[in-house]
Amino acid sequence: MSETLYTGISQLATPRPGPQRGAAMGDLHIIEDAALLVRGGVIQWVGPRAAAPTATHVHDLGGRAVVPGLVDPHTHAVWAGDRLSDWEAKLQGATYEEILARGGGIRSTMRATAAADVAELVALARPRLASLRASGATTTEVKSGYGLDFDAELRMLRAVRELQAEFELRPTLLIHVPPQEGRAEYVVGVCAELIPQVAREGLAEALDVFCEKEAFSVEETRTMFAAAQAHGLRVKLHADQFHAIGGTELACEVGALSVDHLEASGAAQIAALAASETVATILPGVTLHLGLPAAPGRQLIDSGAIVAIGTDLNPGSSPLFSTQLALALAVRLCLLTPAEALSACTVNAAYALGLSDRGSLSAGQRADFLVLNGQDWREVAYTLGGNAVAEVYLAGAQL
C-alpha cells in the first residue's frame, strides 16, 4: 500500500473532525512547519515536521499552506439553456413576474433541461464541476429539480451518476417547482412513483424539497419527507428564502440533514436550528447575484447552530462557479470569520451531506486536501477573483 509523507507545509490549518458549532467553529488546529502522512488514501498522522515518522515516499510541498478539501453541499450543476436574458431584464427593472410572462424564469430552464438527453446534460455539467473542483471542492452535492416531468428528473440524476466518480458527487432528488395544474396528484406521484424508482436505482442519497409560499407547503413537504425516509433516503430542505413558513421547524423536527438558504430566518428559526443536529447551510452567492438580504450567518453561529456554506450554483440566482469564492463571500456578506468559514466549508458541509470521513486533516480521515499558492491558510478566505488553490489532492492523489 502506497505511503507518502508530505513535508514543506508552511502552515496546516484544519477544524477538528465532526460537526462544529458555536465557538468551536473558529477554533482551528493550526500547525506551523507541518507534515502529513498518507497511506492508502487515508491520513495516518499529522503534526510538526520535526516529529514526523519515516515513510516510503516523501513529497515536499514547497513551503506552502495546506487546508482540507472543500465540500460544496448545495449545487444545481446539471441544467441546459441559460438565463442571460432574464438577468439583463432584471437589471433593467423587470419584475420576476414580468420575466415569467415573457417565457423566462425557472420554467425556461426546465423546458431546456427537459429537452436535453443524458449525454447532453453530462457534457454541459462537466466543465461546471471542473470549475468547482479547481476552486478546491473535493466533494460536491448535485441536485435534480429542473425536470418538467418525472422522466426529466430521472435523466438529470442519471447524468449526475455518469459524473459521480469523476467529481466525487453526492446526488440529491429535488422537488422544486409545483406543477401549474394537478398539484395534489403531483405530490402523490412523487411519493408513489418517483421516490420509489429513485431509491430502487440508487440515483440519490437524499430528497430535497423547496418549502416556500410560492412552492410546496409544510404539509406537502412533510408527506414527501415521510415517503423518502420510508425508502431509505435522507431529507433536506430549501427553506426561509423569502418567507419563514415553518419549513425550518419541520426539518429540525424530522432530523433533516440540512436547511438551506435561511435569508428570511428569524429568532424562532435560528433557535430551532441551534437546538438541533440539522445543519444551517448559507448560500452567499444568492445574496451577491440577486441583491437580497444575506442569511444571518453571524447570529446562527453565535446561537450555537451548525453552519455550512454552499455555492447554490444555478443559472437563475447564483451563477457561482467557485466554492472557494462562496467561502470568501460568507466572510464579507454573512459576517463569518475566516476560521469559521473554513469549518463551514469543510467538516460542517460534509456533515450536511451525512459524511463523517472527510473535512478535517486528522488521522483516519480521507486525505482530501488543498495546497495553496501562499504560506498563510487565510489566503483561501481573503482572495477574490483569483484562485488561492495551487494543487488539489483527492484521497492522497493529486488531481
UniProtKB/Swiss-Prot annotation:
Keyword Cell division part of the UniProt annotation: no
Keywords, ordered alphabetically: Cytoplasm, Histidine metabolism, Hydrolase, Iron, Metal-binding, Zinc
Cofactor note: Binds 1 zinc or iron ion per subunit.
Location of this chain's protein in the cell: Cytoplasm
Gene Ontology CC: one annotated term: cytoplasm
Binding positions (Fe(3+)): H74, H76, H238, D312
Alphabetized Pfam families for the sequence: Amidohydro_1 (PF01979)
Enzyme Commission number: 3.5.2.7
Region (Disordered): 1-20
UniProt similarity note: Belongs to the metallo-dependent hydrolases superfamily. HutI family.
Name listed for the protein in its UniProt record: Imidazolonepropionase
Protein source organism: Deinococcus radiodurans (strain ATCC 13939 / DSM 20539 / JCM 16871 / CCUG 27074 / LMG 4051 / NBRC 15346 / NCIMB 9279 / VKM B-1422 / R1)
Gene behind the chain: hutI
